[in-house]
Amino acid sequence: TALETTPEEVKELVSGKTLVTVAQINEWVGNQVARNGHNLIFPYPEKSLVLVQSAKERMLVDFKQKKVEWKQSIPQQAQHQDWHAGSRNLAYTVQGNLFVLTSEDKSLQISTDGSTDGTDNIVYGRSVHRDEFGIRKGTFWSPDGQKLAFYRMDQSMVPSYPQVDISTRISTTYTDHYPMAGETSHQVKVGIYDVATEKTVWMQLVGGPEDYHTNLSWAPDGKTLYIFELNRAQNDMRLMAYDVETGKCLKQLLQEKSDKYVEPQHGLDFLPWDETKAIMQSQRDGYNHLYVLDVTTGNATQLTKGNWVVQELVGF
């Protein structure tokens, strides 16, 4: 169903029927949590549930039953929150360490050696590699939300440089680890945490310690993790497949080289009707285009072509 949101309510686009109003949600919740209809999220297409979140709580409100079905308290100081709608598990960071809060409010600490002194020498669950190559976050839930792939970044060997924060009313300074060209870069590892066993498996990454590990993508069955790995010179990229249970590298699916640069920006988007094939984006012909990748063979068939670029894959 297509929906139309306004600051006051949410309507069905075709019929014009009002599904729920902001005032109704606040009445059922018991306080002024919902402030704008544009911010309401409907995470389940087949259910009458709307996700409402404040700084302290995350709630699922049933607008047909007119009540709160489920709620989760958000831990204090929680940052980089990553909530999975299926399992309702929440990944988050506090300072340099990574945690999971289960749907039953059980708190699980994944890491203990992350920096807590403000240096950010070692951090978990954050965006890495200077936010390049499509990296926008540091946690990646499996399709069922029971396993969490995450980054661990050690930048203790990288000098800190003063920076200016101009987002504040009066600009302030802070320090930031920045690897200058030719100098030692930070080192990144990829781990997978199993919520059920409370254990972490580290991927046995192929390549050098300063390689870029980008665009992590889960297989639909949750058994394989795909990583686009790029050398520091940024001219040699390999798509690798890793076994989630053991961390071992299963195979190299493909390799792209360039005398200029290779710039992976997107993960794999698997076809809903065929788990062996995924849409891959590549600039191998000089323009960003779509390819159908067979993950069993590594063969990539070009789907779009021309002297133009694909800006975005909207969906299926």
Task: Briefly describe each language-model feature range.
Residues 1-316:
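Beta-propeller folds
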